[in-house]
Amino acid sequence: MAKAKFERTKPHVNIGTIGHVDHGKTTLTAAITKVLADKYPDLNQSFAFDQIDKAPEEKARGITINISHVEYQTEKRHYAHVDAPGHADYIKNMITGAAQMDGAILVVAATDGPMPQTREHVLLARQVGVPYILVALNKADMVDDEEILELVEMEVRELLAAQEFDEEAPVVRVSGLKALEGDPKWVKSVEDLMDAVDESIPDPVRETDKPFLMPIEDVFTITGRGTVVTGRVERGIINVNEEVEITGIRPETTKTTVTGIEMFRKLLDQGQAGDNVGLLIRGIKREDVERGQVVIKPGTTTPHTEFEGQAYILSKDEGGRHTPFFNNYRPQFYFRTTDVTGVVTLPEGTEMVMPGDNTEMSVKLIQPVAMEEGLRFAIREGGRTVGAGRVTKIIK
């Protein structure tokens, strides 16, 4: 069979299944791929349950995560779907952002209703900025009582509302297992679910449409031309002769103009998200810029020293610390391209954090870092990763 080529014509959306470990996330994921492969055979292939369940290990910021990626298409969109089978894997993925989500399908078994893990996943989705959640009420074939289904649906809506998600989000009754077996009623339920995903999850803003930002990895001088900063464009577009600011690490922000853009030794008029480029900058001495700063569209992001974050601390088996840490812990926080030392304050009532825990923390950095909510960081001790997190709130 000819491999379907990646069509750039359709919007691309990253989604994932979240929810309690026994509520059928992986079965439902397999069912989605099968139902769509049957409905649009020229666009899709199906993935068997065990292909998804035997999730390959991935390293994200030094942390090993078991996670499965499948892709499929509806008429409207191209989807990349992640499924983290284990609870710990899910938490690690959310915090390290091995796979970012533009929206999530919260899977809740109609037989059980929301469980503590369900709540934890929704809370985490809120903290790490998942934009939208809709609900698959799974195993609905096993509940005959309409009142029970309505009760579970109400509970789930309350749970979403409590974390400021859309209380009116679609709640679709499905059976992943029956759909996989080809039962027409439940195949239709999965088709309905995907229609709801198409309709309710908003189109993501493309990286190229966001304001320009490039973390500086290296700085050097080209004799007779000036200073060049290199890095990978994180978002947005940069054109020759545009004004930029260089910010972070140092107390002051510098304004300059990009007079040349180079990629693979060729001169370009434009660099965009994903490109590794060198930017020639006017009137800046080599010693005025350094790795760890960012080049930005003027005024679009600011440097900060104090923030709140959500972090996952590696267990001993994952190569993390062997002992807990306490208030006033002073590791390095690795943002984008550089380490900055910070002092950690734990939440009230938390005496210490054990390896393998996930925790909230307040951090005070010794140098400012250009950041916004959602920015990821690694926690390091002398170059060794001991944790990963993301900024949930900027304080100062």
Curated annotation (Swiss-Prot):
A GO molecular function held by the record: GTPase activity
Tree of life domain: Bacteria
Pfam families per the UniProt record, alphabetical: GTP_EFTU, GTP_EFTU_D2, GTP_EFTU_D3
Region (G3): 83-86
Reactions this protein catalyses: GTP + H2O = GDP + phosphate + H(+)
Keywords: Cytoplasm, Elongation factor, GTP-binding, Hydrolase, Magnesium, Metal-binding, Nucleotide-binding, Protein biosynthesis
A GO cellular component entry from the record: cytosol
UniProt-listed CDD domains: EF_Tu, EFTU_II, EFTU_III
Chain intervals for the UniProt region annotation (G2): 62-66
Matches recorded under InterPro entries: EF-Tu_GTP-bd (IPR041709), EF-Tu_GTPase (IPR050055), EFTu-like_2 (IPR004161), EFTU_2 (IPR033720), G_TR_CS (IPR031157), P-loop_NTPase (IPR027417), Small_GTP-bd (IPR005225), T_Tr_GTP-bd_dom (IPR000795)
Segments of this protein annotated with the region G1: 19-26
Region entry G5, spans: 175-177
HAMAP family in the cross-refs: EF_Tu_B
Name under which the protein is recorded: Elongation factor Tu
Organism from which the protein derives: Nocardia farcinica (strain IFM 10152)
Lineage: Bacteria, Bacillati, Actinomycetota, Actinomycetes, Mycobacteriales
Gene designation per UniProt: tuf
